[in-house]
């Protein structure tokens, strides 16, 4: 007889109440109301979700699980495999399940319904949506509309303390008035220093500001270190080096708040992983990259038909492995750019951008992508200047005359894939992922919380909580001074 992990573990009081509420909801004939399971890091959401899915399996319903990101889907697949559960439909992103079309708007992706969206849930009795805090209002509305005609039951699982979707003040899933809700408040996962730190930041037992320098706090369940900036960077580089040696990029990541800090940290991370070669080539074979924005069809020599959508080759936050790199001269004349005035203002004598073409792999998908020149390079400055000039011309032409000019602008912009090393991520991009060791940059923690407006205090609290709770084993912070050292030390040891 096959034994499953956690099979003999008893439920906490919170989990039992949630399980009972779910059972009652599952037996109701009216499936119109969704079920929302919320809980903080370590409260047992994944463990309980597997228990709930066993109930669904026993009921005979056709079911599947989805999440907003590919990384989060991978975590779900692993949990299902460990539990021996087999969904009716292969786990995927929610966008794929609902047959949504992704469109790029600036640096954001917007989802739109397609002809297949309305019938996407026709043969499914239940869908569990993990990492629900990342679901924005538009996506939530589409999911509810798709479920209604087929009486498909929707289960949302997420952490209300995480960052809300971009552009929204709160996660709309947890603000739904018409839903059956259950909340896991008791933290039951290993009470090591990592989870202790996350809990203390979430409930404000510790101030969300630059921490004091502390000796390492460690146990069999993990470690938290607060180091000066130099030691922190050295430790981060060593962690990345070891992760690369083990061919396990998820073993260590650096997380920061701003893109400016990310660009400053990337060279240090690349040197740690690739040595002297990092300074000689902007991209190297074997390097793990992440899509910083959606990659559109003009950036791929394979065309859009091999990607995720006809015009969109890859969504943002997709991790890729570089298999080969070659230089490329991108002739902008192919995109209608040849005017002397445009070229001279952009510092280009001829309509050519010197860049790289990378053969990349993501799972079974292989693509050849023209890369955006690296930040700070002459080619990048020329490209940015040209795009700025094209946008100015389009605005000056107005609505009637600017349509063709905007089309040319978007063709040039989308002709280059914006990729970056996955070793350094912003906290926002890290949501839905977990890593062995996490090195949190100092821009995540403000120096003085009291100087910030109330909404910014809440934001940094969520930011720090998400950063710390990405770690499975170890967290390393940048510290300064010794103020509040005693209270931090006690809190991390669970003495508060």
Model regions and ranges:
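Conserved helicase motor core of P-loop NTPases
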Residues: 22, 30, 160-382
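Conserved alpha-helical scaffold flanking the Walker A/P-loop in AAA+ ATPase domains
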Residues: 107-121
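Conserved adenine-nucleotide phosphate-binding loops and their immediately adjacent elements
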Residues: 1-9, 38
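Conserved helicase motor core of SF1/SF2 NTP-dependent helicases
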Residues: 14, 20, 38-43, 47-51, ...
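C-terminal accessory regions
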Residues: 333-496
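Generic structural signal for buried aliphatic residues
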Residues: 18, 289, 320, 435-438
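N-terminal pre-P-loop "Q-motif" helix
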Residues: 8-26
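Short hydrophobic/aromatic beta-strand immediately N-terminal to the Walker A/P-loop
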Residues: 34-38, 64, 253-255
